[in-house]
């Protein structure tokens, strides 16, 4: 058997002498007892046992192979170099191998005494061992990583003493120091960082502070101080942000409360009259006149004594003026009229009409009924103070003038004015309508004649129209005013 890859041949024949008895003795069956086998072995002659064979010497050959590959041996091994005599035994084999199994262990103390060392064996070297390469991949055992000693750090201390003003070595200087001190770059950087930290703690810092380099960390104290400063800045920013958020939330809350207050002021009013106070606000003289006239003259003199509302006060709600105050005042007058007798009949009759006829009166009823007391004062045309016939003298309000007023204040005109006042918003009413009606006394006659000529109301009105036409020449009037009044009133007569 040969090993050409190892560079030397090797014979596989046994190199130890043995006898047949020895083989038979070693290979006896296990059925025999221990005492019998011991007695048989002692009776025979000593023999050489085949302890080492070729396969048992592979480890030794492998170690020597690495030595041969490294050039320790100049030529391949042969059997003539004494490799076969690697382990030799003396003539007496019982001194090395005792066949007595019950022999004491003291006899083995001289077992290795008779084994001489061969000339081919060399002293142990760690480079020839099984783990001959260290972790850095080099054969030099002196370059292995080890702890820094005073001898190695003396070079670093000398360099630090020379560079006290700038104890920050560059990359090249670190490599040079690592080669000189046989240390790694990490060890050199760590040593310099610790040295700077130690000098700073001892207040021996002779260099200006600098920012962190890319290849090393700053001292621990500098990092702590900067972290504290950053934390304080962050805390200040958080506090300022919190204060701003609180102010914004407070402003939003105040805004919401103000909106709620406005909403309450608008929505929580229970009375409609309070909401419409700007439209209702007017002097109370008209109501006082209405109450006094209703008591004294059966609501007839309201036409003459009612003040003319100016153009700025046309926005008041006529529904409130006509119905609600009138009904309330007439209720008060009914209580007072029990003592005054017949003076309260007109107001009581007016209250009955308002209670019995809440709807709009029909044209047929208004055309057939000419009794002035059946209608409230709001349905009568407000004229008198500005008309020349009523303002001339107190005698002008006599029978002919009363007849003319009654016929001029016919239900059609009163109904028209009342509908315009109730169902039209004050913003859509022109301020010249009531002025035109009060500045002339013949506006109704002209309007009535025009309507009769067109044939729209000929059937419903009949005799009162003829009476008005017959009395028209007796009434002094101004044609210019009449024409202007007709244009102004006609444009607003039947507004939808």
From Swiss-Prot:
Residues 141-203 bind DNA. Residues 221-231 have a biased composition (Acidic residues). Pfam families: Homeobox_KN (PF05920). Gene3D superfamilies: Homeodomain-like. SUPFAM superfamilies: Homeodomain-like. One of its GO terms (molecular function) is DNA binding. Keywords: Developmental protein, Differentiation, DNA-binding, Homeobox, Neurogenesis, Nucleus, Transcription, Transcription regulation. It is found in: Nucleus. Expressed in the neural plate in overlapping patterns with other irx members, which all share an anterior border of expression. Broadly expressed in the tailbud rhombencephalon (hindbrain). Outside the nervous system and at tailbud stages, expressed in the developing otic vesicle, branchial arches and prospective heart region. GO terms for cellular component: nucleus. InterPro entries: HD, Homeobox_CS, Homeodomain-like_sf, Iroquois_homeo, KN_HD. Residues 203-236 are annotated as: Disordered. Disulfide bonds: none annotated. Its main location: nucleus. One of its GO terms (biological process) is cell differentiation. Belongs to the TALE/IRO homeobox family. PANTHER family: IROQUOIS-CLASS HOMEODOMAIN PROTEIN IRX, IROQUOIS-CLASS HOMEODOMAIN PROTEIN IRX-4. Acts partially redundantly with other irx members in neural patterning. Required for formation of the posterior forebrain, midbrain, hindbrain, and to a lesser extent, spinal cord. Patterns the neuroectoderm in both the anterior/posterior and dorsal/ventral axes. Does not appear to play a role in pronephros kidney development. This is Iroquois-class homeodomain protein irx-4. It comes from Xenopus tropicalis (Western clawed frog). The lineage of its organism: Eukaryota, Metazoa, Chordata, Craniata, Vertebrata. The gene is irx4.
């Amino acid at each position: 058997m040969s090993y050409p890859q190892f560079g030397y041949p090797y014979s596989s024949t046994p190199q130890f002498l043995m006898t047949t008895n020895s083989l038979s003795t070693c290979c006896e069956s296990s059925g025999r007892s221990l005492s019998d086998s011991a007695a048989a072995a002692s009776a025979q002659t000593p023999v050489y046992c085949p302890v080492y064979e070729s396969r048992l010497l592979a480890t030794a050959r492998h170690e020597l192979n690495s030595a041969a590959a490294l050039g320790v041996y100049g030529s391949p091994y042969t059997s003539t170099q004494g490799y076969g005599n690697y382990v030799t035994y003396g003539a007496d084999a019982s001194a090395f191998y005792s066949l007595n199994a019950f022999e004491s262990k003291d006899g083995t103390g001289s077992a290795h005494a008779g084994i001489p060392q061969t000339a081919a064996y060399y002293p142990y070297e760690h480079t020839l061992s099984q783990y001959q390469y260290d972790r850095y991949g080099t054969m030099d055992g002196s370059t292995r990583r080890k702890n820094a000693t005073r001898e190695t750090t003396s070079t670093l201390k000398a360099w630090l003493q020379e560079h006290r003003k700038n104890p920050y070595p560059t990359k090249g200087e670190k490599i040079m120091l690592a080669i000189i001190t046989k240390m790694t770059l990490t060890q050199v950087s760590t040593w310099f960082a610790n040295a700077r930290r130690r000098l700073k703690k001892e207040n021996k810092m002779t260099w200006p502070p600098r920012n962190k380099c890319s290849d090393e960390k700053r001292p621990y104290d500098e990092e702590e101080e900067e972290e504290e400063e950053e934390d304080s800045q962050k805390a200040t920013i958080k506090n300022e942000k919190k204060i701003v958020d609180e102010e914004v939330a407070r402003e939003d809350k105040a805004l919401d409360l103000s909106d709620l207050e406005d909403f309450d002021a608008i929505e929580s009013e229970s009375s409609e009259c309070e909401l419409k106070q700007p439209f209702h606000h007017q002097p109370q003289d008209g109501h006082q006149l209405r109450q006094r006239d209703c008591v004294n003259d059966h609501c007839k003199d309201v036409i003459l004594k009612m003040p003319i509302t100016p153009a700025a006060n046309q926005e008041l709600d006529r529904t409130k003026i006509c119905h609600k105050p009138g009904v309330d005042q007439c209720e008060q007058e009914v209580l007072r009229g029990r003592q005054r007798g017949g003076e309260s009949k007109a107001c009581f009759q007016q209250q009955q009409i308002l209670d019995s006829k809440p709807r709009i009166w029909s044209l047929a009823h208004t055309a057939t009924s000419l009794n002035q007391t059946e209608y409230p004062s709001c349905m009568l045309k407000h004229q008198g103070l500005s008309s020349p016939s009523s303002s001339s003298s107190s005698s002008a309000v006599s029978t002919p003038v009363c007849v003319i007023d009654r016929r001029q204040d016919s239900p059609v005109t009163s109904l028209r004015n009342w509908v315009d006042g109730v169902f039209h918003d004050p913003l859509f009413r022109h301020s010249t309508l009531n002025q035109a009606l009060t500045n002339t006394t013949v506006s109704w006659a002209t309007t009535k004649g025009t309507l009769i000529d067109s044939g729209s109301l000929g059937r419903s009105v009949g005799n009162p129209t003829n009476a008005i036409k017959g009395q028209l020449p007796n009434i002094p009037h101004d044609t210019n005013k009449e024409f202007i009044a007709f244009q102004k009133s006609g444009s607003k007569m039947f507004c939808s």
